[in-house]
């Protein structure tokens, strides 16, 4: 059987030679790895595109709600103002979650593409799986279909991690992985906060305008 080298071959050879295993056994580790990683990246790319569409829709909704709130203030319609403001706040929360998910998934894609061997995969995948699970819990509140879609990604990543750890002889440190996952999410959230400030109207302007109208 002819064996085709891949970018994973260096780590595979070193692990298998250390265990005195024969070269043909390398095939079972290399055959399925690349297409499985590509499948995960394809799923992640689909999610990023989906997040983009949701964000565009939310931005349009936000602008419409903001204009309606301004009108309700001018008309002194307090009931309408309270209802619209509540809808706007809910929409902003969803926007933050979706923006966070988009930024994180883009970072995860970049990290996964930089993996050069099985050891890299274990180090990179360990926190990624934790991140995806955290995002899944947040997203299902706003996009229920994300539960199944992100569940599939988690399963694919988990299977790759198990195989990569076995070949590389690594033991996954879940405590460290979870800490790294939270750092990644926290850093992404800081970016989201700035983007929200830049791209959306300031809600404090509404409070000022509403107060002024009540004083008239």
Annotate each predicted stretch with a short phrase.
Residues 1-56, 115, 120-216:
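Long C-terminal interaction segments enriched in charged/acidic composition
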Residues 52-95:
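N-terminal interaction modules that seed assembly of large macromolecular complexes
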Residues 61-65, 101, 131:
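Amphipathic, well-ordered alpha-helical segments in soluble domains
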Residues 69-73, 112, 116, 142:
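Secondary-structure edge/capping motif, primarily at the C-terminal ends of alpha-helices
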Residues 91-111:
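Amphipathic alpha-helical coiled-coil segments
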Residues 83-86, 100-103, 107, 123, ...:
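Amphipathic alpha-helical interaction segments
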């Amino acid at each position: 059987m002819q064996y085709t080298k891949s970018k994973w071959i260096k780590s595979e050879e070193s692990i298998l030679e250390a265990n005195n295993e024969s070269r043909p056994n390398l095939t079972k580790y290399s055959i399925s790895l690349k297409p499985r990683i590509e499948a995960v990246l394809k799923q992640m790319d689909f999610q990023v595109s989906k997040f983009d569409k949701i964000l565009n829709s939310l931005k349009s909704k936000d602008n419409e709600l903001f204009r309606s709130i301004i009108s309700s203030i001018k008309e002194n319609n307090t009931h309408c103002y309270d209802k619209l403001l509540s809808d706007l706040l809910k929409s902003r929360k969803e926007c933050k979650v979706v923006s966070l998910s988009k930024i994180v998934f883009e970072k995860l894609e970049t990290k996964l593409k930089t993996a050069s061997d099985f050891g890299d995969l274990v180090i990179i995948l360990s926190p990624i799986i934790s991140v995806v699970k955290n995002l899944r819990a947040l997203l299902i509140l706003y996009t229920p279909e994300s539960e199944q879609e992100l569940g599939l990604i988690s399963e694919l990543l988990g299977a790759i991690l198990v195989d990569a750890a076995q070949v590389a002889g690594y033991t996954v440190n879940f405590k460290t992985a979870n800490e790294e996952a939270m750092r990644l999410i926290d850093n992404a959230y800081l970016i989201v906060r700035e983007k929200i400030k830049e791209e959306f109207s300031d809600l404090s302007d509404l409070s000022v305008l509403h107060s002024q109208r009540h004083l008239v």
